[in-house]
Every structure is written in structure tokens, then in C-alpha cells.
Amino acid sequence: MSSGGLLLLLGLLTLWAELTPVSSKDRPDFCHLPHETGPCKAKIQAFYYNPIYDTCLKFIYGGCEGNANNFKTMDECKRTCAE
């Protein structure tokens, strides 16, 4: 392959790497769990990461059990799973 072709390939690979979003494999596994209210009856506003929409959303947490895809703030959710 000519040096011009190699340079073009390197440029395209660099562009692809810059434009490709962070892979979901870099997120903790629990970010892919569905939100889970749990069996308790409290009505606590919480946030979970939704991998389909690649964003954090609100849900009502019951106050016990559930899973690790449960954050007290939107910022905490985004820092952990969405960035």
C-alpha cells in the first residue's frame, strides 16, 4: 500500500475513533439492569440509566431491595453510566 493510502487509512481510523460514542462495554454491568421499584411502599424519587435511550430517567423507588441501577441524583447516574 502506498504511503498516501496508509495516511488516508490512518486519517479515517482517527476520525472514526473520535466520532464513535463511548462503548457500552465501558459502563458497569449494573447500568444495563432494568429499574426496579422493590417491594417496599415508600415513594422515593430516584434515577436509573436506560441503555436504549442512552440517558438517565426518573423512577419511583420503594425504599428497599431493588438493584444497583438506582441513583439518588441525576448527576450521579450520568457520571456512573451515561458519560
Swiss-Prot record:
InterPro entries listed in its UniProt record: Kunitz_BPTI, Kunitz_BPTI_sf, Prtase_inh_Kunz-CS, TFPI/VKTCI-like
PROSITE patterns from the UniProt entry: BPTI_KUNITZ_1, BPTI_KUNITZ_2
Expressing tissues: Expressed by the venom gland.
Chain positions of site Reactive bond for trypsin: K41, A42
Compartments reported by the entry: Secreted
S-S bridge residues: C31-C81, C40-C64, C56-C77
Top-level taxon: Eukaryota
Cited Pfam families: Kunitz_BPTI (PF00014)
SUPFAM superfamilies per the UniProt record, alphabetical: BPTI-like (SSF57362)
Main location: secreted
Task of the protein: Serine protease inhibitor.
Protein name: Kunitz-type serine protease inhibitor 87
Taxonomic placement: Eukaryota, Metazoa, Chordata, Craniata, Vertebrata
